[in-house]
């Protein structure tokens, strides 16, 4: 039978662990509130940006097809894909990171490229020859400029024909207990998906004038829209591994 001294030490150890756990909970709750507040603050901007793009798309010419909509077909039938993978900078998240990485490896082929955000993803894939770029700072402190840094090279390679498709893989949070890995296509864009919503009664939107032309305006705004997707998801993403 354990002595009273050992029992006392065990009780004290459990109490200390509880204090640490409570402190971690308070910190993570604060980070979650801050991240969600930041997301809500920037959401109107990116909503308006998407609305702007959807109003430009109908004015684009059918020919030539803008590169962002170009569905390429290679002779070998093997498209060159890039995957932007959003993971955490910490590993205390159970399946949060593992499910994202599992989905990546299930979908990727040998000729694909990986652009990894977060230290966990980098550590898991650092020996994989398909890893071409990593952003270990991107998960902890996301910003619009960092989101641009993450996407600009992949977008340039798509426009030049080095890449045929670009995908984003991240964790979609359903609620406090449920999440799932999700893969969405960034490029080529789906023209039908970007059509403007029908204008209702009292809609303040008027006719749009595109200067110098629709092609140029779309060329400038579409990358910003994609940067915003990365940034917005990152704001929510950073709070989850410490919840």
What are these language model-derived features?
Residues 1-235, 239, 243:
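C-terminal beta-strand-loop-alpha-helix "lid" module of Rossmann-like NAD(P)-dependent dehydrogenases
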């Amino acid at each position: 039978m354990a002595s009273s001294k050992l029992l006392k030490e065990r009780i004290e150890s459990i109490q200390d662990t509880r204090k640490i756990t409570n402190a971690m909970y308070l910190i993570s709750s604060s980070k979650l509130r801050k991240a969600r507040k930041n997301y809500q603050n920037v959401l109107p901007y990116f909503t308006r940006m998407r609305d702007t793009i959807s109003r430009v798309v109908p004015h684009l010419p059918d020919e030539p097809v803008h590169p962002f909509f170009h569905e390429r077909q290679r002779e070998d039938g093997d498209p060159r894909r890039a995957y932007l993978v959003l993971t955490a900078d910490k590993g205390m998240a159970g399946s949060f990171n593992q499910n994202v990485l599992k989905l990546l490896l299930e979908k990727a082929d040998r000729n694909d490229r990986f652009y990894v955000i977060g230290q966990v993803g980098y550590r898991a894939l650092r020996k994989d020859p398909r890893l071409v770029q990593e952003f270990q700072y991107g998960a902890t402190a996301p910003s619009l400029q960092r989101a641009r840094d993450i996407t600009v090279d992949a977008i340039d390679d798509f426009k030049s024909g080095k890449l045929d498709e670009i995908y984003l893989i991240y964790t979609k949070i359903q609620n406090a207990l449920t999440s799932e890995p999700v893969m969405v296509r960034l490029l080529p864009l789906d023209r039908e998906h970007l059509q403007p919503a029908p204008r209702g009664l009292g809609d303040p939107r008027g006719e749009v004038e595109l200067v110098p032309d629709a092609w140029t305006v779309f060329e400038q705004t579409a990358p910003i829209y994609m940067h915003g997707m990365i940034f917005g998801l990152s704001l929510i993403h950073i709070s989850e591994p410490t919840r």
